[in-house]
Amino acid sequence: MMERFEKIEMKIPAKAEYVAIIRLTMAGVANRMGFAYDDIEDMKIAISEACTNIVQHAYKEDVGEIAIVFGLYENRLEIMVADNGVSFDFNNLKRKVGPYDISKPVEHLPENGLGLYLINTLMDDIQIMHDEGMTVLMTKYIQREQVENDGNPISTYESY
């Protein structure tokens, strides 16, 4: 049996001024689903990075579109961000991108390329497909229980 979900689809021009619309839409959807504030903030950064990457690299001189699909499941939100622009070799880039190396001076940090590392760090799962253009599928699971239910209550009174 196929898992039930609801789908929201959007298309925006691949311009920086429209990225905020996607970020706000995602935050509203995630809030309705019951995501924690910190998880929503993480997803806002991840979706901004994915869209900004398209704006900066996908279409060169042409103005294209960014397609966004939100898959709302009972336990997770899947976000697909896609373009039909210029693709790149993700596996090659992934080998070059990684966590900050504390032994290197800050002047040697790359100015770009950390977007995919950030997305990978902030989301629970990420898949990237590239053919004609690029598709990034990001998944974040809802963390409903933040505290163990059978723990002992904390008292504010001192015992003597």
Swiss-Prot record:
It comes from the Bacteria. One of its GO terms (molecular function) is sigma factor antagonist activity. The keyword ATP-binding applies. Its EC number is 2.7.11.1. Transmembrane segments: none annotated. GO terms for biological process: negative regulation of DNA-templated transcription. NCBIfam families: PRK04069.1 (NF003144), rsbW_low_gc (TIGR01924). Negative regulator of sigma-B activity. Phosphorylates and inactivates its specific antagonist protein, RsbV. Upon phosphorylation of RsbV, RsbW is released and binds to sigma-B, thereby blocking its ability to form an RNA polymerase holoenzyme (E-sigma-B). PANTHER family: ANTI-SIGMA-F FACTOR RSBW-RELATED, SERINE-PROTEIN KINASE RSBW. Belongs to the anti-sigma-factor family. This is Serine-protein kinase RsbW.
